[in-house]
């Protein structure tokens, strides 16, 4: 089950 999540910082 997926829900809208806040944007995450770019992975290193």
From Swiss-Prot:
Gene Ontology molecular functions:
peptidase inhibitor activity; toxin activity
Keyword ATP-binding attributed: no
Q: Which UniProt keywords apply?
A: Hypotensive agent, Metalloenzyme inhibitor, Metalloprotease inhibitor, Protease inhibitor, Pyrrolidone carboxylic acid, Secreted, Toxin
Primary location recorded for the protein, binned into one broad class: secreted
Q: Which tissues does the record link to its expression?
A: Expressed by the venom gland.
GO terms for biological process? regulation of blood pressure
Q: Subcellular location, in the record's words? A: Secreted
Signal peptide residues are none
Modified positions (Pyrrolidone carboxylic acid) in chain numbering = 1
Q: Which domain of life is it from?
A: Eukaryota
> Would you tell me the Gene Ontology cellular component terms?
extracellular region
The UniProt function text for this chain reads: This peptide both inhibits the activity of the angiotensin-converting enzyme (ACE) and enhances the action of bradykinin by inhibiting the peptidases that inactivate it. It acts as an indirect hypotensive agent.
User: Which family does the entry's similarity section mention?
Assistant: Belongs to the bradykinin-potentiating peptide family.
- Official protein name in the record: Bradykinin-potentiating peptide 12d
Lineage start: Eukaryota, Metazoa, Chordata, Craniata, Vertebrata
